[in-house]
From Swiss-Prot:
Pfam families for the chain: AAA_22, Cdc6_lid
GO molecular function, one term: ATP binding
UniProt-recorded name of the protein: ORC1-type DNA replication protein 2
Keyword Nucleotide-binding listed: yes
A single BP term in Gene Ontology: DNA replication
Residue sites binding ATP per the record: 73-77, 209, 221
Record keywords: ATP-binding, DNA replication, Nucleotide-binding
Length: 376
């Protein structure tokens, strides 16, 4: 009996990780800023971006481009991938600006100043005009300005920034182009006609990933990020399912990493489905909170009303909204479009009296969304 007990303990111990062991082969592949050597299912978009940037690599002006598509469709990844490869080949000069971090024109112009001149921008007492005059006066090679998530800018700010860049070739004789990215496909239509008249660009569209594409992308991350055989097949299928339901590859990547960390914390040599469920319960809250930061107070108010009840017709919901907030139907409709684009709600058709009626409902657990709103 004593021998059997010792054998049982030894067998169990072999299934446990020691303190200096890890399941992760390359943990960096799960980082938000990681760009793989191969981007799956975006060959067409990469080719279009390369065609826009190629003139700059030949000492000519880049072609303007607008990358449009829902969140988590590869816009940022393809842009940064092409920039990385172009910089390796020719030392392309570019200024990459992630708008949520630079929401004001002066901050955007300061970033361009820093990237072009290789030094910190002067104190904020210097006007934007003087700041950009120094940039354009010292620019002696083609420049590409990337405005990622430009839809986070207010319309007036976007017009001011775009106009400053677009007028530079005529006023200073410089070679400069713009690559902008937005989750709102209608954003280009919101620009001032005066800006739009001079902002000619190639539209590059990014459709949502399908189930098989999400599975393929996440499979590559598992192969490169974990040691072979570590991630259980059932656990992986669950991650793919949750990522597909959220329509967000990034969420799947978050879950892969979090599930691996959960398995390590309990000393397991295998990532199991229970690790994914624990990760999902914890990560969904922070993931949703991050999405909610893209909403203003009115948009959050509408979202709260949607999540406070079961499926409701868009007409009935509008009446509820107007009882609390003064809002035109056009603005209300645009808010619903944005919430759907961010994958926070679902809009479907159903029968109600004559014809078809649109119904709206939340995609996530109402309690989780409520808690996420309290975090921001």
């Amino acid at each position: 009996m004593q021998v059997k007990r010792i054998i049982h303990i030894n067998v169990s111990f072999t299934l446990m990780l020691s303190w200096d062991e890890t399941l992760f082969k390359n943990p960096e592949v799960f980082d938000p800023d990681y760009i793989p050597d191969e981007l799956l299912f975006r060959d067409g978009q990469i080719r279009q971006l390369v065609s826009c940037i190629k003139p700059a690599m030949l000492n000519s002006s880049p072609i303007n481009a607008f990358c449009l598509g829902p969140p988590s469709t590869g816009k940022t990844s393809t842009i940064r991938y092409v920039l990385r490869e172009a910089e390796r080949e020719t030392g392309l000069l570019y200024s990459y600006i992630r708008i949520p971090r630079f929401k004001e024109p002066y901050k955007v112009f300061s970033k361009i100043f820093q990237d072009v001149l290789g030094q910190q921008s002067p104190p904020s007492g210097i006007s934007k005009t003087v700041l950009m005059d120094r940039v354009w006066s010292n620019l002696d090679e083609p420049l590409l300005v990337v405005l990622d998530d430009i839809n986070f800018l207010g319309k007036n700010y976007a017009n001011e920034i775009l106009y400053e860049i677009l007028k530079a070739p005529d006023e200073y004789g410089v070679k400069v182009g713009i690559v902008a990215a937005a989750t709102d496909v209608k954003f280009p239509l919101l620009l001032d006609p005066f800006v739009g008249a001079s902002f000619h660009y190639m539209e590059i569209h990014y459709p949502s990933y399908g189930y098989a594409e999400i599975e393929g992308i996440l499979r590559k991350r598992v192969e490169h990020g974990f040691y072979e055989g570590v991630f259980d097949d059932g656990a992986f299928r669950r991650v793919v399912e949750l990522a597909y339901r959220a329509s967000d590859v990034r969420y799947g990547i978050y879950l892969l990493k979090a599930a691996g960390m959960n398995a390590e914390s309990r000393g397991s040599r295998k990532v199991e489905e229970r690790d994914v469920e624990v990760a999902h319960a914890g990560e969904s809250l922070s993931f949703i909170a991050k999405i909610l930061t893209a909403l203003n107070s009115e948009e959050r108010a509408v979202l709260r009303m949607i999540y406070s009840q079961n499926a409701i017709s868009t007409g009935d919901l509008y009446e509820q909204v107007c009882s609390e907030i003064k809002m035109s139907y056009r603005k209300y409709y645009n808010i619903l479009e944005k919430l759907e684009r961010l994958k926070l709600i679902e809009i479907s058709f159903g029968e109600k009296g004559r014809g078809k009626t649109r119904y709206v409902q939340g995609k996530y657990d109402a309690e989780v969304v409520d808690r996420a709103m309290q975090l921001i």
